[in-house]
């Protein structure tokens, strides 16, 4: 969250609401009935954490309202009735959801005006394009969204319920196989950090597995909060490989490369060349080193041989949805 015209968000925090597991544990602490974001994260030991956004779609409106309240009053410190608001939504967000969002903004927060933009379209704007295909992968959901002259093509947007959270779960599982135990929500956050700091995507998975067997070049160590040091090797690239091979975690879905290709093939034959040449990565789960090269290699193998393929991975892609929103909301044409 932040202000239009800024080049980076002012506030970045997880969409989590935590409630005390046992009432009255923290006597005299002036205990709140709910904590949001980082505070919920840091007090997770005594809280039950809930994620009001599931697979990119809001599923718990009471908690979502708490998150928005926290954003306006604690993070940005603005009066929501003072300025127009730009919100973003997942592709294929049900109309009823958009209406509910609008209703809460106008009735609870008394916003003077609001607009709801599709996340992938904003990422494309942030990359300086109006035509292309965006692979947007966050914590709960991934989408491939073909966009032509600023308009998303809804018939060609597959939703892939495979994203950051699944990769964290998978890493927890394969680290357990190595003899480390991570089970609680608190430990899951540690594993998420390991994932973000040490994972990468192999250009050739089979070859990387062989390398890992014979040499220790892929091994890295990580210090846990309690001072214990763990060593992680092939897990580094086995974790995000799931994006290309969902069958590794028992999912029947196509990988992100195939999903992108299928999405392009659902579009009019005349615009495919523009899509192949403008494949834009967006979201935190596209931050793995090596992802653009691998994506390019896989799409090249699927596409017609003469086709020029370009995969763009902007350095700021973790926040490109927000950056696109900042650009859009500061246009004078948009404000009218």
Swiss-Prot record:
PROSITE patterns with a match to the protein in the record: ACTINS_1, ACTINS_ACT_LIKE
Keyword line: ATP-binding, Cytoplasm, Cytoskeleton, Hydrolase, Nucleotide-binding
A GO MF term: ATP binding
InterPro entries: Actin (IPR004000), Actin/actin-like_CS (IPR020902), Actin_CS (IPR004001), ATPase_NBD (IPR043129)
Location in the cell: Cytoplasm, Cytoskeleton
Cellular component annotations (GO), alphabetically ordered: actin cytoskeleton; cytoplasm
Gene3D superfamilies found in the cross-reference section: 3.30.420.40, Actin, Chain A, domain 4
Catalytic activity: ATP + H2O = ADP + phosphate + H(+)
Primary subcellular site in the record, as a coarse category: cytoplasm
Enzyme Commission identifier(s): 3.6.4.-
Pfam families per record: Actin
EC category: hydrolase
CDD domains documented for this protein: ASKHA_NBD_actin
Entry keyword annotation includes Membrane: no
Note: There are at least 5 different actin genes in tomato.
Protein family per UniProt: Belongs to the actin family.
Job of this protein: Actins are highly conserved proteins that are involved in various types of cell motility and are ubiquitously expressed in all eukaryotic cells. Essential component of cell cytoskeleton; plays an important role in cytoplasmic streaming, cell shape determination, cell division, organelle movement and extension growth.
The protein, known as: Actin-52
């Amino acid at each position: 969250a932040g202000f239009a015209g800024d080049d980076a968000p002012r506030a970045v925090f997880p969409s989590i609401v935590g409630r005390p597991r046992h009432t009255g544990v923290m006597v005299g602490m002036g205990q709140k009935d709910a904590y949001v974001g980082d505070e919920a994260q840091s007090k997770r030991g005594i809280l039950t954490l809930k994620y009001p956004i599931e697979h990119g779609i809001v599923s718990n409106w009471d908690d979502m309202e708490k998150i928005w309240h926290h954003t306006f009053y604690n993070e940005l410190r603005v009066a929501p009735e003072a300025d127009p608001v730009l919100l973003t939504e997942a592709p294929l967000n049900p109309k009823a959801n958009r209406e509910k969002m609008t209703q809460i903004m106008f009735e609870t927060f008394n916003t003077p005006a609001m607009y709801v933009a599709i996340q992938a379209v904003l990422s494309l704007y942030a990359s300086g394009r109006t035509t292309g295909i965006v692979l947007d992968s966050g914590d709960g959901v991934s989408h491939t969204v073909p966009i032509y002259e600023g308009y998303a093509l809804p018939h060609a947007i597959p939703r892939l319920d495979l994203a950051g959270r699944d990769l964290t779960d998978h890493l927890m599982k394969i680290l357990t196989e190595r003899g480390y135990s991570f089970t609680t929500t608190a430990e899951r956050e540690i594993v998420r950090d390991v994932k973000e700091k040490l994972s990468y995507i192999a250009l050739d998975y089979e070859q990387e597995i062989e390398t890992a067997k014979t040499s220790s070049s892929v091994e890295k160590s990580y210090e846990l909060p309690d001072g214990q040091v763990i060593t992680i090797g092939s897990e580094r690239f086995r974790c995000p490989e799931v994006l290309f091979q969902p069958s590794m975690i028992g999912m029947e879905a196509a990988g992100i490369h195939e999903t992108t290709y299928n999405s392009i093939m659902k579009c009019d034959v005349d615009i495919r060349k523009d899509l192949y040449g403008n494949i834009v990565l967006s979201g935190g789960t596209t931050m793995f080193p090596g992802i653009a090269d691998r994506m390019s290699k896989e799409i090249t193998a699927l596409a017609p041989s003469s086709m020029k393929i370009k995969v763009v991975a902007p350095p700021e892609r973790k926040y490109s949805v927000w950056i696109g929103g900042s650009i859009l909301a500061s246009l004078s044409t948009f404000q009218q």
